[in-house]
């Protein structure tokens, strides 16, 4: 499996489907308040994936590499296997487009993620800009 494919499959594909993108910006941005927090695919238990510690939250040790989960905190987005810097957040027609610089233990890559806050407080993650269904995520901690 190639490095780019590995990053997609294990780094972000485990909780945040994304696709490789070109350079979008240079200054890191803080994600909007509606996106901040620990997110988990709705069919999973927050208590089995996250460990709250005061005002912060982290992944339970040992980390479940396959958990469909991510944490957005300030200018950072973390999955069980990747840590990303949010370069920019741009509004799309019905979703936010996040340009990310991500790193795993084996590679670093530029990635784009498509997410949208929903009226019911959940978040939908989209595979690309043509995905109309999305995958719902619940907020475990803010």
Listing of model-derived features with the role each one plays in the protein:
Residues 11-21:
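Bacterial N-terminal signal peptides
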Residues 26-40, 69-72:
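N-terminal helix-cap/turn-to-beta initiation motif at the start of protein domains
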Residues 127-142:
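Edge beta-strand at a domain terminus
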Residues 40-75, 79:
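Short, solvent-exposed loop/hinge segments that bridge or flank secondary-structure elements
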Residues 69-119:
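Contiguous, well-ordered beta-strand patches that form the walls/edges
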Residues 2-13:
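Bacterial N-terminal signal peptides that target proteins for export
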